[in-house]
Design a protein with these regions (language model features):
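Metal-dependent catalytic cores of enzymes that make or break cyclic nucleotides
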Residues: 5-224
């Protein structure tokens, strides 16, 4: 699906319209990825607000969460769902998905906050991530938040090939990654948020199940 816009580029309405249509293209291609992106958007919105981000900035980061895996819609299912180890070429294909998403978002004049977060959400604090091998503070802050929330949702969501971790187990796994995979300060804030909001995981699942599948904004406009 190619988004068809009638809003003026650079406006909030334009941003929302583009993200809505791109999120719908993810849903049409792969409902599992769409639901993952929705939950990550909810989680990163809450984390950003907990860390003191202004409401508007947090919601913009949530939009990045909503389409952070957009690039996977160009990766063949045979690669995405492959149960065995990936070949070098297949791994390179997977590792290009943030670049492909960012290029499309750039073409639609999305804000830098969204572009940076989507492009860099697989970078690691120790510099061993992709696509650019950024390290430490060179990684955009929004991407550092998005990375933690992305991994949290992956490990707490059941899949046919793995059981879901409990919140306690996931909390420990995220903490183990502080200073290597993740920004230690973001991890510290995230664990405090989990302690302060025992319903954190449930909230993401509740929004997913209770809201209209064609309205990806319901959770983000709920005042959280």
């Amino acid at each position: 699906m190619i988004p068809i816009m009638d809003a003026v580029p650079g406006t909030r309405r334009h941003t929302r319209q583009v993200i809505t249509e791109l999120a719908e293209s993810i849903r049409e291609r792969d409902r599992v990825t769409y639901e993952h992106c929705r939950r990550v958007g909810i989680y990163v919105n809450r984390l950003a607000r907990f860390m003191g981000w202004p409401r508007g900035a947090a919601r913009e980061l949530a939009l990045a969460g909503l389409v952070h895996d957009l690039g996977k819609t160009w990766v063949h299912n045979e690669v995405l769902l492959k149960p065995a180890a990936l070949s070098q070429s297949e791994r390179e294909m997977i590792e290009r998905h943030p670049v492909m998403a960012a290029q499309l978002l750039w073409a639609f004049d999305m804000p830098d906050t969204i572009l940076d977060a989507v492009l860099s959400h697989h970078e690691r604090w120790d510099g061993k991530g992709y696509p650019n091998g950024l390290a430490g503070a060179a990684i955009p802050l929004g991407a550092r938040l998005l990375s933690v929330c992305d991994v949290f949702d992956v490990i707490t969501t059941p899949r046919p090939y793995k059981a879901a971790m409990s919140v306690t187990e996931a909390r420990e796994r995220i903490q183990e990654g502080a200073g290597t995979a993740f920004d230690p300060e973001v991890v510290a804030a995230f664990t405090r948020l989990l302690d302060a909001r025992p319903d954190f995981l449930l909230a993401g699942r509740t929004y997913r199940e209770a809201t209209d599948a064609n309205d990806p904004w319901a959770a983000h406009d709920s005042g959280e």
